[in-house]
Amino acid sequence: MQHSERRVVFFDLDGTLHQQDMFGSFLRYLLRHLPLNLLLVVPMGPVILAGLAVSGRAARWPMSLLLWATTFGRREAVLKRLEAEFVGWFRHHVTAFPVVHARLTAYLTSTYADVWLITGSPQSLVEQVYRDTLWLPRVNLIASRTARRWGGWVLTLRCLGHEKVVQLEKKIGAPLRLYSGYSDSEQDNPLLGFCQHRWRVTPQGELQQLE
């Protein structure tokens, strides 16, 4: 079967395959363990909120600024240790959505689907949290990316909203033609718009088909 005949399917991660917001949980975890960084985060709060209000909730730079303020002045070894500790904590507390995982498994065991996991959470966190799952090596992952800049961590890519469309087009070309999409968030509507079948994941992990 040629690739053009295959069914392309995408899944969001946070609120879709599991209940929690991984990146938001990570930022809160860092601030609990690096409380002095609140001295930088709090004064920048109005700038960050204004940036999200003006540029949109999917904008990269306000959340990049928040991540930088949260990690500024900390050695890389300290941040990596906290990241590893967070991964262990998150793996213990995460709530999976079995109904959505069943759909994911069905597509992965089929012979006709190419599955893309497209998430706003940082790639390093996704790969560590789900490192021992059977499904992660079998999906095509597109995620936000982080790097060290100016004494802290920043987001070099925030894979949210229309950026998901841009990144998937870079991988498989435009115009997009997707068979099915699964997400809990209206921020994914730009990508869901290219799907023949669109599914909204409820806060309880159930599926509702969109028109």
Residue ranges with predicted function:
Residues 2-6, 77-84, 88-211:
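C-terminal cap/substrate-recognition subdomain and adjoining C-terminal extension
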Residues 11-13, 26, 71, 137-138, ...:
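Broad hydrophobic/π-residue packing in well-ordered secondary structure
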Residues 50-53, 62-73:
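Helix-loop "lid/cap" segments that line or gate small-molecule binding pockets
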